Amino acid sequence: MDIIYAVPTVLYRMLEMNLPHTHNLSSLKTIRYGGSPISPAKLEILLELFGQIFVQGYGSTECWPSVTILGRKDHGTQTHEQIARLQSVGRPMPGEEVIICAEDGLVLPAGQRGEIRIRGPNTIAGYYKAPELTKKNFSGSGFWKSGDMGYMDEKGYLYLVDRKQDMIITGGYNVYAIEVENCLNSHPAIQNSAVVGLPHDLWGEEVRAMVMLIQGSTTSPAELIDHCKQHLARYKAPKKIEIIDRLPLSPAGKVLRREV
């Protein structure tokens, strides 16, 4: 076996099981991942263990299989710029058009956050026998509205922020669940996490988190909240954290936030 395809959850399990040291993986030449955002901190550890053999693809059922690619050469860790780029999902493939739009459809410049919209040869023309759904999810110029929030940098690399529907609004501030999850997942005791917004009388919503520990590791909710406050704005830190044995996963291995 020289190539594997995996979602980040599977890669986290490979880390926990210390596979490079317990199994002969010398034939493995490529690890292709995608399906959900990966923790940059864990990706750095994976690169140390496996080397620069990772390739990330970003796509959807509506534009299958991939729209952007973060190739092997983009998985360097020698400079701050390279490490920062590990947070991206790469650049559009030839023929693919990716734009970032405001709510009114205005195309935003590099660095500004908005909805990711996609048009290309592998993007569907519409939903079968569903004209209203097609009208809702496609712009007049044929761009599919992904529902993903993100931004592009000056070099054309695309960065995912979160699903539009998963944004938490607490005290008037926007909090993206993936940003808090990445912070939690950077803690050495955490295997994976899920962050949600729950109703709150004063703040509108409050940030809550559920975490799954690496086998044999210990920590406490208070320690994890403090960890978040050290690395994020205080309003983004979870108000409560619950340590659980298992996070709900889809058949593809994605964490199902709405079932937490």
Stretches found by the model and what they are:
Residues 4, 120, 125-126, 133-136, ...:
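AMP-binding/adenylate-forming catalytic core of the ANL superfamily
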Residues 97-99, 110-124, 143, 149-150:
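AMP-binding/adenylate-forming core of the ANL superfamily
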Residues 1-6, 15-84, 97:
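Gly/Ser/Thr-rich phosphate-binding loop
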Residues 35, 59, 90, 148, ...:
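Active-site glycine-centered loops adjacent to acidic/histidine catalytic or metal-binding residues
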Residues 10-11, 38, 123:
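Alpha-helix capping/helix-boundary segments
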Residues 86-92, 107, 138-141:
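Short Gly/Pro-enriched turn/cap motifs at secondary-structure boundaries
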Residues 25-28, 190, 238:
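Core-facing hydrophobic residues within beta-strands of well-ordered domains
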Residues 55-62, 90-92, 196-198, 242:
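Beta-strand->loop->alpha-helix junctions that form or flank phosphate-binding loops
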